[in-house]
Amino acid sequence: MLKLKNIIWLAALVVTISSCDDYLDTPPVDKITSDGFYQTQAQSEQGILGIYADLRQASNCMYWFMSECRSDVAWVEPNPDAFREYSEIGTFRATDDMAMFNDTWNMWYKVIYDANVAISKIPSASFDSESIRNQFLNEAYFLRGWAYFELVRLFGNVPMVDRPMSPSEIKSVKQSTAVDILNNRVIPDLKKSEDLPYKADMQDANGAKIDKKGRADKMAAKAMLARVYMTLAGYPYNDTNAKSLAKTQLENVLDDSHAAAYWAPSLEEWQKQWMPTDAYYNKYSIFAIQYRTGGTGNPAIFNMLPVKIVPEDWSKNYNFSQNSIYVEKTLMHEFDRE
């Protein structure tokens, strides 16, 4: 009898433990994984918007610190008495453990990861409109191609991940050469994105026009392709065919944009390209990362805002924000020339 009771108690304990295991394995109800997402047209657009959201830091870490501060456009004051990332980068003293390098790397690979998920999921999602499906897919291709282009431009050889992978899989991915990534990933992705609609024909998941929402369109794809070809035409690639390809793309951009309407006959008109209109978008913008009013904002503003938005005298050396980053004097001289 005692043995039978022990068997019953043991069986009850096993059932209880199994039940607890099942309970602990219950998926969280407040989060949707990629396997449960990308089921509908609306969810697919949310995923695409999530990729654009990954770009929040691009203007700051990518284009300001990692690009302009290292260029001939800006002069960065050496600061031997204090650590300032912009100073270390701008004077080419930065070491490989600098946080800005890591932040930039992670930002672009987050774009790539999310784009890979979208590209793998959208084809099997339920869509009411095939044209909208193709638009969303081509936006993902544009963003992935752009991300790899910037990684190559900054870091050279990098790992090329073209599908969703587990962490263990990614560890086994070796670096690809920069020219291989440009020719076999960046250009093919951007060529696919050339099938995007023109700005006026871009739609959201509900079919509404989104021509002023800052999303990549056909013109953005052509202009980005031109950037890639111009990069290939120069050092260290020296591709002899790339210059003519860039010229063709830029001619297409000018032809499609009715270039005659974009001429600025006066300084006031020229300044409009830097000043937001009521709708934020302006005719001089091909593609720009936009920040929602009332959102978290553009972090670069606090690092690059001139003391005077419209300087009265271009011959002065204007300090950007509180950082020791200045407009390069020879560039300012060009604005003083008649």
Where are each of the predicted segments found?
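Bacterial N-terminal signal peptides that target proteins for export
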Residues: M1-I8
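Short, flexible loop/turn elements at secondary-structure junctions
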Residues: K3, P164, Y291-T293
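C-terminal motif of bacterial Sec signal peptides marking the signal peptidase cleavage site
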Residues: I17-S19
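An aromatic- and glycine-enriched ligand-binding surface/loop that stacks and positions planar moieties
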Residues: D21-F83, L190-E194, R215-E338
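Conserved, well-structured interaction surfaces
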Residues: T40, E45-S59, D81-F155, K171-N184, ...
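Structural recognition of the beta-strand scaffold that forms the well-ordered cores
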Residues: I119, L151, P159-V161, S285-I289
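Structural signature of alpha-solenoid helical repeat junctions
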Residues: S129-F136, L143, I210, D217, ...
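Short coil/linker segments at helix-helix boundaries
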Residues: N157-V179, N184, P236-S244
